[in-house]
Swiss-Prot record:
Keywords: Ribonucleoprotein, Ribosomal protein, RNA-binding, rRNA-binding. Part of the ribosomal stalk of the 50S ribosomal subunit. The N-terminus interacts with L11 and the large rRNA to form the base of the stalk. The C-terminus forms an elongated spine to which L12 dimers bind in a sequential fashion forming a multimeric L10(L12)X complex. The gene is rplJ. Belongs to the universal ribosomal protein uL10 family. Forms part of the ribosomal stalk, playing a central role in the interaction of the ribosome with GTP-bound translation factors. Disulfide bonds: none annotated. The keyword RNA-binding applies. Pfam families: Ribosomal_L10. InterPro entries: Ribosomal_uL10 (IPR001790), Ribosomal_uL10-like_sf (IPR043141), Ribosomal_uL10_bac (IPR022973), Ribosomal_uL10_bac_type (IPR047865). GO terms for biological process: translation. It comes from the Bacteria. It comes from Onion yellows phytoplasma (strain OY-M). This is Large ribosomal subunit protein uL10. GO terms for cellular component: ribonucleoprotein complex; ribosome. One of its GO terms (molecular function) is large ribosomal subunit rRNA binding.
Length: 169
């Protein structure tokens, strides 16, 4: 018979494994000397983007990551680590934790999983500095309409010069 405590741990591993397997983004970060008030502030900021921040025991994290076929991430789970799990958003949690880590030196991003691929700290920094989807769409729209705008300006200038040459018309 399985002891109740062991049963809870097995359930925790299974739940975390499922979350990791279905998440779009998982970020591992150190929080060792972060005050509770700052951790709660981070939690509130991430909740706006439908993310979950949770501290799990190291063994549960390691087993869940291994069961989720992300074995390379186990090496980053030494010491006091927390997970940000985002089932829907891809870049927003990365940007949020990156900006939070710049303000709070106690938070150190370690690694993560983006679309089931393990990413390094450098890749996370690159993703965090990308423009948002709305900004990218605005840039695309501006670049698509720029030639038309230049054509309209050129034609307008041509009409203006013709009017100056022939003021009778």
């Amino acid at each position: 018979m399985i002891k109740p405590q062991l049963s809870k741990k097995i359930d925790s591993v299974a739940v975390l494994q499922e979350k990791i397997s279905t998440a779009k983004t998982v970020i591992v970060f150190e929080y060792a000397s972060l005050p509770v008030s700052s951790f709660m502030q981070l939690r509130r900021e991430l909740k706006k983007t439908s993310c979950e921040v949770k501290v799990y025991p190291k063994n549960i994290m390691q087993r869940a990551v291994t069961n989720a076929k992300q074995d390379d991430l186990v090496t980053f789970l030494k010491g006091a680590k927390a997970l940000i799990i985002s089932p829907q958003e891809l870049l927003e949690p990365i940007k949020t934790i990156y900006n939070f880590a710049k303000k709070n030196k106690a938070v150190k991003i370690v690694s993560g999983i983006v679309e089931q691929k393990i990413v390094s700290l450098q890749e996370i920094k690159t993703l965090a500095t990308l423009p948002s989807k709305e900004q990218m769409l605005a840039l695309l729209a501006a670049s698509m309409f720029a030639p038309l705008q230049h054509l309209a300006i050129g034609l307008n200038m041509l009409v203006q010069t013709k009017k100056q040459e022939n003021p009778q018309q």
